[in-house]
């Protein structure tokens, strides 16, 4: 019997989830300088899954916000496996307000299975927190650049994913649902996750072909194999994106962001026929 070959999309999913894959704070340490983390949403508490603060990018003051998952058991618990609670999104809203007040470009970094689905999160307004973040990012006057580092899962990713430019690492994924979740809904079994991953179109090259992502950063066989090279490749692309956005007038930039969002799902993207 011929051995079945593993789908390219499912291979990408597995690389995106690799336990040694660089995480948000690894990139911060390599790409930015003088990072100073800020804590709390001034409403309920601090969320370890959402990390953010002031930093410098090539000497320029910026705001950096991202989801951190953790590696050790202690770290994973501290950062809630990268699954944000409402206070995480409200913390990011506070930092976005600060960025606009002081005219700081914003860099967001996505790496989450999704927003935390616990009862407490729902009681504290998870959906409202994400919706408010979407609205705020849509109208922010400063440049916003979002990067998908590993998993970009559903609304949890979108909460910091609305941007002027979106970047994906070549083995990252970005989707409305996990392949396992999709398979469980469509086929009543998570065993068809590989098939679901193909159907979801969650890979960087597919999303770039649809115009949803502007840049794809090459990471070879996986960022965990040569993290320093991948981080430097990403830094070059971040600089390119920022250089494109800085000369634009704030109103012009907001209008371009609006038009970028409005074209999603249109015929010119090849989604509808």
Curated annotation (Swiss-Prot):
It is an enzyme of class 2 (transferase). GO terms for cellular component: acetyl-CoA carboxylase complex. InterPro entries: Acetyl_CoA_COase_a_su, ClpP/crotonase-like_dom_sf, COA_CT_C. Residues 1-244 form the CoA carboxyltransferase C-terminal domain. GO terms for biological process: fatty acid biosynthetic process; malonyl-CoA biosynthetic process. Keywords: ATP-binding, Cytoplasm, Fatty acid biosynthesis, Fatty acid metabolism, Lipid biosynthesis, Lipid metabolism, Nucleotide-binding, Transferase. Its EC number is 2.1.3.15. Pfam families: ACCA. Pathway: Lipid metabolism; malonyl-CoA biosynthesis; malonyl-CoA from acetyl-CoA: step 1/1. It is found in: Cytoplasm. HAMAP family: AcetylCoA_CT_alpha (MF_00823). Belongs to the AccA family. Acetyl-CoA carboxylase is a heterohexamer composed of biotin carboxyl carrier protein (AccB), biotin carboxylase (AccC) and two subunits each of ACCase subunit alpha (AccA) and ACCase subunit beta (AccD). Component of the acetyl coenzyme A carboxylase (ACC) complex. First, biotin carboxylase catalyzes the carboxylation of biotin on its carrier protein (BCCP) and then the CO(2) group is transferred by the carboxyltransferase to acetyl-CoA to form malonyl-CoA. This is Acetyl-coenzyme A carboxylase carboxyl transferase subunit alpha. It comes from Acinetobacter baumannii (strain ACICU). The gene is accA.
């Amino acid at each position: 019997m011929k051995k079945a070959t593993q789908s390219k999309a499912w291979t990408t999913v597995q690389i995106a989830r690799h336990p040694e894959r660089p995480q948000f704070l690894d990139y911060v340490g390599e790409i930015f300088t003088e990072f100073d983390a800020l804590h709390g949403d001034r409403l309920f508490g601090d969320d370890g899954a959402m990390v953010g603060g002031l930093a410098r990018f090539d000497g320029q003051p910026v705001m950096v916000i991202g989801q951190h998952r953790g590696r050790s058991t202690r770290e994973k618990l501290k950062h809630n496996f990268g699954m944000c609670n409402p206070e995480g999104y409200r913390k990011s809203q506070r930092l976005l307000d600060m960025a606009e007040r002081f005219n700081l470009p914003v860099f967001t970094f996505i790496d989450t299975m999704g927003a935390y689905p616990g009862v407490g999160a729902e009681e504290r307004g998870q959906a409202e927190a994400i919706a408010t973040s979407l609205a705020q990012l849509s109208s922010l006057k400063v440049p916003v650049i979002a990067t998908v580092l590993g998993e970009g899962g559903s609304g949890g990713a979108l909460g910091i994913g609305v941007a002027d430019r979106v970047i994906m690492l070549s083995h990252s994924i970005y989707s409305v649902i996990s392949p396992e979740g999709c398979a469980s809904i469509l086929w009543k079994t998570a065993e068809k996750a590989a098939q679901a991953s193909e159907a979801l179109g969650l890979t960087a090259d597919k999303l770039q072909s649809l115009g949803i992502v502007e840049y794809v950063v090459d990471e070879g066989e996986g960022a965990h194999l040569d993290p320093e090279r991948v981080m430097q490749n990403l830094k070059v692309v971040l600089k390119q994106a920022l250089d494109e956005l800085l000369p634009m007038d704030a109103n012009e930039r907001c209008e371009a962001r609006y038009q970028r969002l409005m074209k999603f799902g249109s015929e010119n993207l090849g989604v509808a026929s």
